[in-house]
Amino acid sequence: MERIKELRNLMSQSRTREILTKTTVDHMAIIKKFTSGRQEKNPALRMKWMMAMKYPITADKRITEMIPERNEQGQTLWSKMNDAGSDRVMVSPLAVTWWNRNGPMTNTVHYPKIYKTYFERVERLKHGTFGPVHFRNQVKIRRRVDINPGHADLSAKEAQDVIMEVVFPNEVGARILTSESQLTITKEKKEELQDCKISPLMVAYMLERELVRKTRFLPVAGGTSSVYIEVLHLTQGTCWEQMYTPGGEVRNDDVDQSLIIAARNIVRRAAVSADPLASLLEMCHSTQIGGIRMVDILRQNPTEEQAVDICKAAMGLRISSSFSFGGFTFKRTSGSSVKREEEVLTGNLQTLKIRVHEGYEEFTMVGRRATAILRKATRRLIQLIVSGRDEQSIAEAIIVAMVFSQEDCMIKAVRGDLNFVNRANQRLNPMHQLLRHFQKDAKVLFQNWGVEPIDNVMGMIGILPDMTPSIEMSMRGVRISKMGVDEYSSTERVVVSIDRFLRIRDQRGNVLLSPEEVSETQGTEKLTITYSSSMMWEINGPESVLVNTYQWIIRNWETVKIQWSQNPTMLYNKMEFEPFQSLVPKAIRGQYSGFVRTLFQQMRDVLGTFDTAQIIKLLPFAAAPPKQSRMQFSSFTVNVRGSGMRILVRGNSPVFNYNKATKRLTVLGKDAGTLTEDPDEGTAGVESAVLRGFLILGKEDKRYGPALSINELSNLAKGEKANVLIGQGDVVLVMKRKRDSSILTDSQTATKRIRMAIN
């Protein structure tokens, strides 16, 4: 206050005012400050005094031929004086106005294509809805966000090659366009930009916006998808927020969202299969998201989410070095520890073997709805500062930190036995056992933790065991803060290893991720996810499993038929029959299987009893481990549509309906495909026509290898012998004729010879 009074006093004297307004600036330091270097020191002032001049703009000489010397009002538009130090002319701002009104019109067809990202942004804002403004404290945390809606996901190098190819196709320099997306984009853009007059540099800049993901590390308190980030300045301030619903979606956000859903579904499914890693890879390679191969998206998309990271690690890609526990991302910010196995006793006197981290460490914990700073020593929580959206989110973070601290009072707070299992029915590791236990009910944990009086620190308050805030007391070491904890900003990626149970370790052997960390949240994907792997058939429920299993048999019938007669055990073990087993009542599975296998063996032994439709229908039942029993069945039960439905052993039913005339199969009323080969019993005619050029020598001879299908016969050399599977499921030995002349007689003799060879 004193200084302000003093200044007011000074200003009231006329001499002060005169000195400040009239004195010239002749101090060398000041002159230097404003004249050294090319960088403009006061752009606003410079602009003002430039524009006060008559001709502040310079232009190419050619402009004098395109613009009149004076406008309609008789004002001069350009000066006859040359610009000092260049051969350009001095032009008045009025010339710009004249040009905008009367200058040549160019073709605007390319503008929406080049400035696509801008045009789309305008549309989104036009159709977006802004809601009320709320004044409240904003817990913002810095997150790495995508600031550029509507982009493809090319790497900088890939994009550079595409841009060079589109904008400067004749420039020298090796450009290799390999990925499918590169080729598609290049073709599309070349067509769009034919005869484009916009400067190539501008086109290149705009293409870069469309092709490359741009991320920034920004403070955010709400949605993080790019259509929210583009209006960040409109939706959240320091103490206010405005509700906003985007007026459109962009593909890059949809890809991110669908990728997370696909990855979660795949990891959950792989975790319960016999070889999780192999299954996961098989599924990633056979899945498409929005028509693009999932593995291509994984290579390009920087999304960091537990399931996505597991898929990336399985593919040998680098991932972030932070680790996950209880749905929070932990990043160690200081300290270090060594790990040692230790046995501890729970409150229920159950022994747990845990890996104890010995040493002082500090971590940041970042979750979707809460963040925290954790300081801990060996099996002791020193301090936990949490901030979160609501009481529930704050409680989640506290539970995770307390379990992670491995404190004795946490382990002693366990009531009852710990026997949580994962989806594959395997026991969880001790740390996850503890986590699940307290996530179900943390009352005892919070009560046993202990409270302490707290000092009044700005921006921090205490929290009591019942989760109510307090300014006097708080649970030991725990404080609630108004400020969020920033996400880890580095984009550094590290090499990791993955074991067959999908546990991911860094090079020091620390576990960064495991399937237990994958969220159980279900969502609906924005883009179509196509899982081609049989392991994902069950994602759409039992009906889909049934239809898909039969579709698979029909599509692969040629190979299935050969295996059925030659190597049935291998056929029964095919993974494509795995999902089907979940539809068959557990108690009777083995009996069904034994019954079908016996039936099939009789078909192989007794000639002429081969029945294509019946084999297709019963085959999936034979895949379960068989139990020998004398039971006979006329129908099998499958659990679909919420109840048991029946498949008749002989004949059609609503579940399995094969039309012999059209060779079309419908399963539960859905089309399951058409059989390409003739399943009727009278196939001798067809076979004899196909066997032209082959001499039938007699019964199957094992020395000549496994039976070929009729289609494979064409590969035989003249005089070569082979076993062939013919329509009735019987195998005969044939030889390819050395001379072509006798072909005609083959078709007549074939029919007789087949009958003889068989009988």
From Swiss-Prot:
It is found in: Virion; Host nucleus; Host mitochondrion. It comes from the Viruses. GO terms for molecular function: RNA binding; RNA-directed RNA polymerase activity. The keyword ATP-binding does not apply. Its main location: virion. A motif (Nuclear localization signal) lies at residues 736-739. It holds the Pfam family Flu_PB2_5th. Keywords: Cap snatching, Eukaryotic host gene expression shutoff by virus, Eukaryotic host transcription shutoff by virus, Host gene expression shutoff by virus, Host mitochondrion, Host nucleus, Host-virus interaction, Inhibition of host innate immune response by virus, Inhibition of host MAVS by virus, Inhibition of host RLR pathway by virus, Inhibition of host RNA polymerase II by virus, mRNA capping, mRNA processing, Viral immunoevasion, Viral transcription, Virion. SUPFAM superfamilies: PB2 C-terminal domain-like (SSF160453). The record marks 627 as: Mammalian adaptation. GO terms for biological process: 7-methylguanosine mRNA capping; cap snatching; DNA-templated transcription; symbiont-mediated suppression of host cytoplasmic pattern recognition receptor signaling pathway via inhibition of MAVS activity; symbiont-mediated suppression of host gene expression; symbiont-mediated suppression of host mRNA transcription via inhibition of RNA polymerase II activity; viral RNA genome replication. The keyword ATP-binding does not apply. One of its GO terms (cellular component) is host cell mitochondrion. Belongs to the influenza viruses PB2 family. Influenza RNA polymerase is composed of three subunits: PB1, PB2 and PA. Interacts (via N-terminus) with PB1 (via C-terminus). Interacts with nucleoprotein NP (via N-terminus). Interacts (via N-terminus) with host MAVS (via N-terminus); this interaction inhibits host innate immune response. Plays an essential role in transcription initiation and cap-stealing mechanism, in which cellular capped pre-mRNAs are used to generate primers for viral transcription. Recognizes and binds the 7-methylguanosine-containing cap of the target pre-RNA which is subsequently cleaved after 10-13 nucleotides by the viral protein PA. Plays a role in the initiation of the viral genome replication and modulates the activity of the ribonucleoprotein (RNP) complex. This is Polymerase basic protein 2. It comes from Influenza A virus (strain A/X-31 H3N2).
